[in-house]
């Protein structure tokens, strides 16, 4: 659909590097750490409930995850857990906070191809310090006209961003892997949204049902957007 490119001003992107896979591996280790208290599936559920309860206070990111894991330990052990459990969580979390950034396949080539043709904007959510580290380590900063680290990615958050950038919704294309955070809000604002599926998705970001919208683009990989513009 080559009409997507007509008058397109800003192209927004997120999920450029490996992240969710590492976090789910972290959670798997955490659930095994507490297996003497409850089955792993029960620990996972308790942890998710704690995460959801704390989102409005801690926001997104690895530090928020570590705090919710610590609280889950206290709940599951009735406050009698060995300090070694918390030390393990802190150690694993700090390892992830220093983990080298691995770009997803096709990201560098796609961004370099779009650079200079469109204003590229990186819109991501999470811990400010951690996200800034990843952006610098990715080697992609030079390609972006603007970088926005958002506290959340709902309609109002996107509206504030496009108001700041002076880009009307109909000239916006969002490319992302989360239907809930990257696709639906942008479509509702009247922009274009391209979904790049990823094999691992956080339970909070999962979405059921088919998307039917004239501005919705389904891709097999991020490189596929080059054939749509």
In which residue ranges do the predicted regions lie?
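Conserved phosphate-coupling serine/threonine residues in phosphotransfer and NTP-handling enzymes
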Residues: 124
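Asp-based, Mg2+/Mn2+-dependent phosphohydrolase catalytic module
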Residues: 6, 108, 112, 119, ...
């Amino acid at each position: 659909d080559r009409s997507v490119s007509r008058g397109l001003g800003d192209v927004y992107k997120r999920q450029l590097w490996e992240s969710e896979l590492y976090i789910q591996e972290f959670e798997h280790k955490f659930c095994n750490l507490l297996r003497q208290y409850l089955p792993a599936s029960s620990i996972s559920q308790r942890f998710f409930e704690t995460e959801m309860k704390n989102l409005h206070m801690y926001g997104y990111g690895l530090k928020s995850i570590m705090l919710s894991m610590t609280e889950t330990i206290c709940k599951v052990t009735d406050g009698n857990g060995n300090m070694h459990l918390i030390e393990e969580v802190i150690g694993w979390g700090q390892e992830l906070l220093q983990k080298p950034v691995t770009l997803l396949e096709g990201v560098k080539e796609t961004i370099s191809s779009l650079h200079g043709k469109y204003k590229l904007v990186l819109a991501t959510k999470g811990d400010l310090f951690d996200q800034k580290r990843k952006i610098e380590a990715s080697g992609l900063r030079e390609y972006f006209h603007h970088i926005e680290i958002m506290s959340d990615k709902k309609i109002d958050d996107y509206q504030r961003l496009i108001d700041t950038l002076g880009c009307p919704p109909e000239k916006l294309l969002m490319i992302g892997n989360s239907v809930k955070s990257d696709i639906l809000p942008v479509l509702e604002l009247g922009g274009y949204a391209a979904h790049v599926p990823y094999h691992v998705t956080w339970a909070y970001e999962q979405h059921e049902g088919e998307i039917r919208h004239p501005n919705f683009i389904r891709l097999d990989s991020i490189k596929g957007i080059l054939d749509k513009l």
